[in-house]
Amino acid sequence: MKVRPSVKPICEKCKIIRREGKVMVICENPKHKQKQG
């Protein structure tokens, strides 16, 4: 899980979702998981 100021999809399988007011990227590849912080 990477925490960064701006989250971007890295590959075509990355999905941007909102959870508890935070923007997150979820993906099949665990390296692509990101959270805005």
From Swiss-Prot:
One of its GO terms (molecular function) is structural constituent of ribosome. One of its GO terms (cellular component) is ribosome. One of its GO terms (biological process) is translation. It comes from the Bacteria. Pfam families: Ribosomal_L36. Keywords: Ribonucleoprotein, Ribosomal protein. Belongs to the bacterial ribosomal protein bL36 family. This is Large ribosomal subunit protein bL36.
